[in-house]
């Protein structure tokens, strides 16, 4: 009922044609599945993670896709499913397009450690220790293991193109 009241107040349409009640359990399930775009429609806003940029292993930089590694400030914040996402990256009052990976980086042999790392498209400055917000738009694919770094690089180029297409269509407000 709270979600419906907020939707009414903010002039957001909730499609109840499937007779599925919108609940916090449903939102959590959608996020665990990586369905961030559907979760956003249910919430009435895009899901986001806030955190601080921390040092990583510099692997992304070495293969032409430098990443900002996020340490999430809220330990109780739900991290969506592993995979690649089109996101908005906001810091210092500016918003940029980002290609986000959540997962264990299986091609790099990261072990069991789950990371949250974003390649900020067309951006080449140092942002270590900066507070950033990642706003999820759409999951583009699950995290996959490739047979070689070259195959990974080829896929990352495709991912970057798809991310730009999605974000240009989304037109950040």
Question: Where are these predicted regions, by residue range?
Answer:
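Phosphate/ribose-recognition catalytic cores of enzymes acting on nucleotide-derived substrates
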Residues: 12-15, 56-173
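Classical nucleotidyltransferase
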Residues: 1-66, 147-156, 164
């Amino acid at each position: 009922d709270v979600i419906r009241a907020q939707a009414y107040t903010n002039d957001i349409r909730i499609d109840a044609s499937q007779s599925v009640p919108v609940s916090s359990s449903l939102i959590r399930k959608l996020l665990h599945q990586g369905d961030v775009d559907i979760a956003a429609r249910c919430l009435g806003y895009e899901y986001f993670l806030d955190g601080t940029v921390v040092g990583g292993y510099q692997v992304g930089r070495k293969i032409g896709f430098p990443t900002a590694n996020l340490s999430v400030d809220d330990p109780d914040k739900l991290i969506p499913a592993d995979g690649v996402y089109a996101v908005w990256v906001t810091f210092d009052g500016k918003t940029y397009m980002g290609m986000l990976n959540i997962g264990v980086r299986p091609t790099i042999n990261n072990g069991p450690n789950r990371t949250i790392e974003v390649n900020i498209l067309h951006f080449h400055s140092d942002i270590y220790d900066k507070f950033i917000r990642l706003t999820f738009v759409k999951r583009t694919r699950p995290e996959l293991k490739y047979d070689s770094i070259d195959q990974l690089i080829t896929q990352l180029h495709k991912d970057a193109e798809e991310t730009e297409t999605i974000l240009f269509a989304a037109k950040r407000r």
